[in-house]
Regions:
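A short, amphipathic beta-strand motif
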Residues: 356-364
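Hydrophobic/aromatic-rich core segments of domains that either
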Residues: 28-37, 49-52, 198-216, 229-240, ...
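Disordered, acidic Ser/Thr/Pro-rich linker "stalks" and the adjacent N-terminal cap
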Residues: 438-494, 500-503, 518-603, 607-616, ...
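Secondary-structure boundary elements
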Residues: 34, 44-45, 53, 57-245
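Extracellular beta-sheet/turn segments enriched in Thr/Pro/Gly and aliphatic residues
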Residues: 339-351, 422-450, 674-678
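Bacterial Sec-dependent N-terminal signal peptides
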Residues: 1-28
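Short beta-strand-plus-loop segments that form exposed binding edges in beta-rich domains
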Residues: 511-518, 657-663
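Short Pro-Gly-centered beta-turn/loop motif in secreted/extracellular proteins
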Residues: 395-415, 502, 647-650
């Protein structure tokens, strides 16, 4: 939804709420109806239809009042593109029993279809769009059907705990975003899940129903694979499009759960983390209102309530509500600075993660300028607001902020944000302290090895090499092979070399650990066998029969930025790229070299799949420290796999930028001779 247009209609509501009306409707309802134009007749049909049913009448009022600012983008070319794309994707044979392999296969096929329709219709992000406002287009029949179907779910025993307000917010809504409206989605899913009503007759636990539906969703919907495409799609996906596509980013996962579960009377919310506190971007997922009126988060087709993992550090977690807060004009002016629709969100951070309050002391020199303070997090490029507070007695208090995050308090003046004070570390235990640059006690020598932290998925790639063995033999079958080296600890993200006692052999190989038992893809970026001269040995590529020279070359090419994967797939028609070895059943996996004759092996080297955020010799880097703003500490050329800076101010935040290439960069501190990421 376009936030600015949403804001403008909210202002209209604010104004109208103070206008006395001689209408038979409430001021807010009249304000909405007055925006409906000729479609007012359709909306009033709904109100007249429910004149004798007080609850359904109130539900109709709730929907109409909160239609303001809700719409679908319109463009005939996009309709044609969507029809061709989703019909083609809907015809794909997608298997759901092995998610990782199938996501990979589906992505290849879907990307081909997407690129084909883009070539035909052009880039949809560059189309000119019209707008179909719900108030001016939704029919009486559509709303009446939606309301009646939603109320029918109140016969289920697991809805007995719901208040009318929660029912309206989390069961009744007919849409979740800007998607084209779909007829009969509630009926479709109620028919699909009518067996649940029989099997759980008398069960009052909504979480039990949620688990069953979520399990079913996992049989026809992949919880990944669509992010690259959908982030370039200008409007939300309809129910029909989601059912055809069957792959997703986290937003589409949340949408599928809303449609499927609300159709069965479950109070399910769309949760959002607009910005992570320790990396770029954000995240979307779901939560269900339990019979104890607590939120239990989950991820559609992936994690049930009680199993979901919030993998990064959220400063704020919000529930998207269908209703919107009534706000004063001053409040509306304040929230203009957020890049998400703050007025439609409810803060649930403390329900899902540990939080602490943060108090900001406003310097005397700024007290006359600062009436509102924004608490900001770093999104890898700039500081973005995630919360705000009014100044009272020279202080601003922020409640229930996520921990283990660096926050920068700022105020807005003359079109830009300005710092109120130093960044604030909110530690894991809730303790707080400022980040203050100390030039009087500098870090005498700072050694930097990365510009971005290693996240869980990166550590996962590294873990896939643990247990691997480097072996040598005098025969190509590796009978009586000698193990030269075993990886027994988590590898770093760069190329590491280890000396061994010299061993003479002709054939050498990298023997994977049992990746199939672990359920991973055995990602490897680079390996090497070191000779007497300290350089990697060369030879003819050898390996299991499923490997070929193109596969094997990937890990012997001296480039740590590409990588080799191993997949198990029985799909003999699948076409995999050259950096993938495909086997049809679990077996020992190995790749190696025929050295052409006996050679001394004096060491091994290896690097796991990584994100290319290491230090590289061909790149130029610039280090900055925060001291009232980012201050450059000079540029350096990469020296093998590290950079060295001397006499650097201590106690503050740093950021390292690659001036040659790349885009990811992250805040860090320097503690006990190491980079600590925030």
């Amino acid at each position: 939804m376009n936030f600015k247009s949403n804001l403008s209609v909210t202002i209209i509501l604010v104004i109208c709420s103070f206008v006395q009306s001689c209408s038979r409707y409430s001021p807010r309802l009249e304000a909405a109806l007055s925006l409906a134009g000729e479609n007012r007749v359709e909306l009033e049909k709904v109100l007249e239809h429910y004149q004798r049913d007080r609850k359904k009448y109130k539900a109709a009022c709730f929907l109409i009042e909160n239609m303001v600012g809700r719409y679908t983008l319109t463009n005939q070319k996009l309709d044609s593109l969507d029809a061709e794309f989703f019909d083609a994707v809907g015809n794909l044979d997608i298997r759901f029993e092995d998610t990782e392999v199938n996501v990979y296969l589906v992505q290849i096929k879907v990307n081909e279809i997407w690129n084909r329709v883009l070539a035909k219709y052009g880039d949809p992000t560059k189309y000119h769009y019209g707008r179909s406002d719900d108030l001016r287009s939704v029919t009486a029949d559509y709303l009446i059907d939606n309301i009646d179907e939603a109320f029918a779910t109140l016969d289920y025993p697991w809805t007995s705990h719901l208040s009318f307000e929660d029912f309206c917010e989390y069961v009744l809504p007919y849409r979740y975003g800007s998607e084209p409206l779909t007829e009969d989605w509630r009926h479709y899913f109620r028919e699909r899940y009518k067996w649940i009503a029989d099997s759980l007759a008398g069960n009052t636990d909504p979480v039990a129903v949620c688990r069953l539906i979520n399990q079913d969703i996992s049989t026809w919907f992949l919880p990944a694979g669509g992010g690259h495409i959908f982030k370039n799609h200008p409007r939300s996906l309809s129910v029909d499009q989601l059912r055809k596509c069957r792959l997703s980013s986290c937003v589409e996962q949340a949408a599928v759960a809303l449609f499927a579960m609300r159709s069965m009377g479950l109070a399910v919310a769309h949760c959002t983390i607009p910005h992570w506190g320790n990396r770029s971007a954000g995240h979307d997922f779901n939560a269900i209102l339990t019979k104890d009126n607590e939120w239990a988060d989950f991820s559609a087709a992936k994690f049930n309530p009680g199993e979901n993992e919030i993998a990064n550090k959220p400063p704020k977690v919000f529930v998207k509500k269908f209703s919107r807060k009534m706000m004063t004009e001053d409040e509306l002016e304040v929230i203009k600075q957020f890049d998400f629709p703050y007025a439609g969100y409810q803060d649930v951070t403390s329900h899902l993660v540990k939080t602490s309050d943060v108090t900001v002391q406003i310097p005397d020199s700024l007290k006359d300028d600062v009436s509102v303070v924004y608490l900001c997090v770093f999104n890898n490029k700039r500081w973005v607001p995630v919360s705000y507070s009014y100044s009272r007695n020279g202080r601003a208090r922020f409640v229930e902020m996520g921990r283990r995050i660096v926050y920068l308090p700022q105020y807005y003046k003359d079109g830009r944000f300005r710092p109120v004070g130093d960044p604030i570390f909110l530690e894991k235990d809730g303790s707080q302290h400022p980040a203050v640059a100390d030039s009087a006690n500098p870090v005498s020598r700072m050694v930097l090895t990365r510009k971005y932290g290693r996240f869980k998925y990166q550590l996962g790639y590294a873990g896939e090499m643990v247990g691997a063995r480097f072996q040598g033999a005098d025969n190509p079958e590796f009978e009586n092979a000698v193990t030269l080296f075993t990886i027994d600890s988590l590898p770093d993200s760069k190329m590491d070399t280890f000396a061994i006692a010299p061993v003479k052999c002709r054939y050498v190989r990298y023997l994977y650990p049992d990746i199939f038992a672990r359920g991973n893809a055995g990602n490897v970026a680079e390996i090497a066998f070191i000779g007497d001269d300290g350089k990697p040995l060369e030879g003819k590529y050898i390996g299991i029969k499923e490997a070929n020279a193109n596969n094997i070359r990937t890990v012997f090419d001296g480039n740590t930025r590409n990588y080799l994967r191993v997949y198990q797939s029985a799909d003999s028609t699948a076409v995999f790229p050259g950096n993938v070895i495909v086997v049809d059943s679990p077996k020992p996996i190995w790749i190696g070299l025929d050295l052409g004759g006996d050679r001394n092996v004096t060491g091994v080297a290896y690097c796991p799949r990584n994100d290319s955020n290491n230090i590289y010799p061909h790149c130029t880097y610039e280090l900055f420290c925060w001291d009232g703003g980012w201050k450059s500490l000079g540029q350096r050329a990469g020296q093998k796999d590290s950079l060295v800076y001397e006499n650097v101010p201590s106690g503050c935040l740093y950021i390292l930028r690659n001036r040659t290439e790349g885009k990811e960069e992250r805040l860090f501190t320097y503690e006990d001779g190491k980079q600590v990421w925030w």
